[in-house]
Amino acid sequence: MSPTPDKQANADAPVAVAPAPGPVSQWLSQQGFEHELLEPDHVGVEQIAVEALFLPVIAAALKSHGFDYLQCQGGYDEGPGERLVCFYHLLAMAEVAEGSADQVREVRLKVFLSREGQPSVPSLYGLFRGADWQERETFDMFGIQFEGHPHPKRLLMPEDWTGWPLRKDYVQPDFYEMQDAY
């Protein structure tokens, strides 16, 4: 008996295969940290999703494991009605500087947030001082609050600006007049 067209189409459909755990994901699992493995980025950097609550603990563990440099922190919007994403890209720079490694190890931590209400993530400013202005910019452009940040103010937009300009559902005002001349 020949398969029906629906069954034939399903048989030809590609099967989604989970990415193989990279070295950082394996290490986190050995340490008992819950996380979700994501596909590596376009250049092969390991990407890991973590819950906002566990971000500081996992980041501190990674720092003690050699990831001593915050290359960048940022955010992006997956689209109207979708999630906001906060990410931290960490490097293990000291290993290369000391000569104990030939190549820099990299990992990107991602926190997926609902756009409803007030999305928030614990600040990593206390762990990586370089997160200061980067977290402020992410707040300014996407409205993601960073709990525990010492200067939770807008960085680029005027203090009285309404909305978050890099959200994909942002509606630009017709007119804005600066109140203070510089």
From Swiss-Prot:
**Superkingdom as given in the UniProt entry:** Bacteria
* Annotated InterPro entries: NADH_DH_suC, NADH_quin_OxRdtase_su_C/D-like, NADH_UbQ_OxRdtase_30kDa_su, NADH_UbQ_OxRdtase_CS
GO CC annotation terms, alphabetical:
plasma membrane-derived thylakoid membrane
Q: Which reaction does it catalyse?
A: a plastoquinone + NADH + (n+1) H(+)(in) = a plastoquinol + NAD(+) + n H(+)(out); a plastoquinone + NADPH + (n+1) H(+)(in) = a plastoquinol + NADP(+) + n H(+)(out)
Cellular localization per UniProt: Cellular thylakoid membrane
Q: Which GO terms describe its molecular function?
A: NADH dehydrogenase (ubiquinone) activity; quinone binding
Q: Which residues cross the membrane?
A: none
How this chain sits in the membrane, per its record, is: Peripheral membrane protein
Q: What class of enzyme is it?
A: translocase
Task: Give any single GO term for biological process.
Answer: photosynthesis, light reaction
- Give the Enzyme Commission number: 7.1.1.-
PROSITE patterns on file: COMPLEX1_30K
Q: Which UniProt keywords apply?
A: Membrane, NAD, NADP, Plastoquinone, Quinone, Thylakoid, Translocase, Transport
Q: Which PANTHER family match?
A: NADH DEHYDROGENASE [UBIQUINONE] IRON-SULFUR PROTEIN 3, MITOCHONDRIAL, NADH DEHYDROGENASE UBIQUINONE IRON-SULFUR PROTEIN 3
> What biological function has been recorded for the protein in this entry?
NDH-1 shuttles electrons from an unknown electron donor, via FMN and iron-sulfur (Fe-S) centers, to quinones in the respiratory and/or the photosynthetic chain. The immediate electron acceptor for the enzyme in this species is believed to be plastoquinone. Couples the redox reaction to proton translocation, and thus conserves the redox energy in a proton gradient. Cyanobacterial NDH-1 also plays a role in inorganic carbon-concentration.
Complex formation? NDH-1 can be composed of about 15 different subunits; different subcomplexes with different compositions have been identified which probably have different functions.
Q: Which protein family is named in the record?
A: Belongs to the complex I 30 kDa subunit family.
What is the name attached to this protein's record?
A: NAD(P)H-quinone oxidoreductase subunit J
Source species: Synechococcus sp. (strain WH7803)
